[in-house]
């Protein structure tokens, strides 16, 4: 479901109600009164889970490093201001708060059994450039609001396990071109070399944290890893960021997994020349070649069966999965020297390719690369394809579904 207007109260409210009900049904001891039966709680639903939550999402949507659109990157001034706001709201909900050495903001309530496995709920507070206000923020605010309802009716201390809300410092990877810095640190899969990654200004991840009075070392980074045995599960409420649920009229859906992702950088080099003097028959134009490569990508991703055979690694199940889940995007393209009267000497563009089937995704990358090289050879231009990011798909726990 894509929320295009804040006035979509019925759909919006159902998301918060779902999370509140999830907390109630899964975490209260059997002898406790569930909040749904409490008249006071029902009135609080509209006050806290709708009105206040909407106001907070609007407030958070105004915290930006840019004028006229929403942008918050890792450890930017707006990101820090957003963290202050969220921390204030966490404490208002009765949570104990702290910031870890990767800049993640945590809010926790221990409940009746502090040694029990904890339920983690959260999302990310950073954004892409020109972001929507609900991406990431919805998952954080909904969790805080649901817990505030429990506090308001005196039930927060009756949770049978700890509940921890996490506002991750980085998911999008806009500033350092390295995604999931915040959650990867908590999961224990972020390499210590990530601290030395630099942004376009030469500032490293470690420098950015230090600039905000957060000291991090290789040892403290490794110490951020949560013991899997201490975690009961992780839950995140998130907007769909697509048109499907809204199109079919469903307010909510349970996600079964996250697609694997491959990001590539493609560099095409040809022969730079004057736009008015080089005959078409003598051109080695990397822009024209790049255009053909991009159209190839679109065709392959729309019709994978036309490019991949059912033999080898791609069985019928894989092809069927690709037909429904494969998506491909060219989001950035640049030319050199980038002048209207100059045939470019070089064109660079990115490829973002995602699919839930890992074998199928690799088959697509392999076939795409082969076809791209053939096109470049035919056009007498050189082509370099670099794999920048690779993420395996994640299939979610069935008992949550």
Q: What name fits each language-model region?
A:
Residues 151-174, 305-313, 321-328:
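Short helix-loop-beta-strand segments that form the rim/entrance of peptidase-like active sites
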Residues 121, 130-171, 262-268, 278-300, ...:
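Alpha-helical metal-binding/catalytic segments enriched in His/Glu/Asp
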